[in-house]
Every structure is written in structure tokens, then in C-alpha cells.
């Protein structure tokens, strides 16, 4: 796992499939909207980065559609086949 500082927030890069993580692209798209989420998933389609927030299953805000445990289903159902993607975990201990 790689620890990162992105726009003043600490994250760990816990998954980087097909080298999908691009710090410059993520920094430009990661807004305050994503701060409450425990995980940020980024996937690439048509040379565009898409971000989606997910919660840990123990988080009170967790629903079926944003539970990190459903990541594989999200990738299969909502992302381009064989796409590049990554998962960032918010570091709450900083």
C-alpha cells in the first residue's frame, strides 16, 4: 500500500489495476464531495476518469449501492470491460 497526500487529505492506494492511478488527474477531480467517503474508486472509460465514493460496511451511511464490499459487482456492472481502476482508502489516523 502506498500512502498519498491528495489536496491536503491522506489516503492509501490499496488497489491499482492496470496502472489506473494518476495523481494529477485524481487531484483535479477529488473535491469536497468525496471527503465523507471511506473509499474512493476511480475507473477509466474513453480516456476519462470517473470517481465514486464508497463506505466501509460498518459506517452508518453505508447502503447496498455504496458498500465497499460490493466493489467487484460495481466494477463488473458499471465499468468498461477490463478497464483500468484504483481504490483509495481514507487514512483516518492522520
What are these regions (language model features)?
Residues 29-30, 34, 39, 59, ...:
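Acidic, Ser/Thr- and Gly-enriched intrinsically disordered low-complexity segments
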Residues 38, 48, 85:
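Beta-strand-rich binding-surface signature
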Residues 63-94:
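Helix-rich interaction surfaces within compact, conserved domain-sized segments
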Amino acid at each position: 500500500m502506498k500512502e498519498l497526500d491528495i489536496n491536503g487529505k491522506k489516503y492509501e492506494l490499496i488497489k491499482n489495476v492496470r496502472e489506473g492511478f494518476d495523481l494529477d488527474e485524481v487531484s483535479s477531480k477529488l473535491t469536497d464531495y468525496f471527503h465523507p467517503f471511506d473509499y474512493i474508486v476511480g475507473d477509466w472509460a474513453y480516456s476519462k476518469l470517473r470517481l465514486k465514493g464508497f463506505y466501509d460496511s460498518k459506517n452508518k451511511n453505508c447502503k447496498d449501492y455504496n458498500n465497499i464490499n460490493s466493489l467487484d459487482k460495481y466494477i463488473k456492472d458499471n465499468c468498461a470491460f477490463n478497464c483500468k481502476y484504483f481504490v483509495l482508502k481514507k487514512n483516518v489516523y492522520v
